[in-house]
C-alpha cells in the first residue's frame, strides 16, 4: 500500500499534527512492528501496567524471538529512569493513562530523558484518544492507537495506527519499510469503517466524559462508597 492510499494513517496523523501515519491490520500488529524498530537483544523501559495484549507481545513473543529485555517501572521520574537505564536501552514505552489506576505518567520526564539519551519514546494513546491527549505535542516520537474500540466506535473492526512525529525521518523510513515487508497493512475497506468512526469521535468522547464525570460525582457524594477513582475529581492524585 502506498502512503497516498493510507487515508486512515493520514487522518490520525493530521489529528495529532504528526509527520506521517500508518494504518495496520490490527492494534497488535502495530505494537509488534514498533518493537521491531530496535535491534535484537535491546532493552526497553516500560510502564508496569501495560495492556494485556502489549504485555504478551513483550514477554511471550519478543523476549523469546528477539531477545528483548524489559524493565517495568511504577513511575517515570528522572531518578527511576536513570536507575533502570542500561547501555543497550533503546526505547521507553508508556501509556497515556495507566491501567487500572488511570494515573497520568510524567510525560515531560519521559520525553526529556529519551531525548537526552537518544532513546525512542513511544506512547500508547488508545485509552485517551487524540481528543483527550496529544502525545506528539507532548514530545513523543511515536504514538500508537488500537483502533478497534474508541477510534472506530465499534468493536467489529480490527485496526491499528502509528503516527511518527516530525523530525524523525529515520524512524519513519524504517517503520514504513517494516510495514511493507511484513505485510501488516489495513485494507481500504477497513480504513473507511474506522474513518467513519473518527467523524464522530469528538462528540462520542465528550458525551462519555460528561456521563462518567456525573456518575463519579454522584458516587463520590455517597457516604456508603469507600472511594471513587476518576481523573475529573479533585480527590484524584493527578487532577489538574
Set out the residue ranges of the language-model regions.
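Conserved PLP-enzyme active-site core in the AAT-like
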Residues: 20-222, 229, 235
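Active-site loop ensemble at the mouth of alpha/beta enzyme cores that anchors a bound cofactor
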Residues: 234-240
Amino acid at each position: 500500500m502506498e502512503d497516498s492510499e493510507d487515508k486512515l494513517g493520514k487522518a490520525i496523523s493530521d489529528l495529532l499534527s504528526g509527520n506521517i501515519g500508518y494504518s495496520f491490520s490490527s492494534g497488535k500488529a502495530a505494537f509488534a512492528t514498533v518493537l521491531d524498530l530496535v535491534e535484537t537483544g535491546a532493552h526497553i523501559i516500560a510502564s508496569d501496567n501495560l495492556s494485556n495484549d502489549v504485555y504478551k507481545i513483550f514477554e511471550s513473543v519478543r523476549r523469546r524471538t528477539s531477545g528483548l529485555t524489559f524493565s517495568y517501572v511504577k513511575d517515570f521520574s528522572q531518578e527511576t529512569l536513570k536507575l533502570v537505564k542500561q547501555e543497550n536501552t533503546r526505547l521507553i514505552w508508556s501509556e497515556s493513562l495507566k491501567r487500572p489506576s488511570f494515573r497520568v505518567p510524567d510525560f515531560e520526564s519521559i520525553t526529556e530523558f529519551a531525548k537526552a539519551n537518544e532513546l525512542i519514546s513511544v506512547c500508547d494513546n488508545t485509552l485517551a484518544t487524540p481528543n483527550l491527549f496529544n502525545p506528539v505535542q507532548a514530545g513523543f516520537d511515536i504514538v500508537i492507537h488500537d483502533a478497534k474500540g474508541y477510534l472506530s466506535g465499534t468493536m467489529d473492526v480490527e485496526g491499528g495506527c502509528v503516527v511518527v512525529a516530525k523530525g524523525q525521518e529515520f524512524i519513519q523510513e524504517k517503520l514504513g519499510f517494516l510495514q511493507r515487508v511484513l505485510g501488516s497493512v489495513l485494507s481500504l475497506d477497513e480504513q473507511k469503517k474506522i474513518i467513519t468512526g473518527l467523524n464522530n469521535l469528538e462528540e462520542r468522547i465528550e458525551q462519555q466524559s460528561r456521563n462518567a464525570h456525573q456518575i463519579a460525582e454522584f458516587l463520590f457524594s455517597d457516604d456508603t462508597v469507600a472511594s471513587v477513582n476518576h481523573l475529573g475529581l479533585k480527590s484524584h492524585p493527578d487532577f489538574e
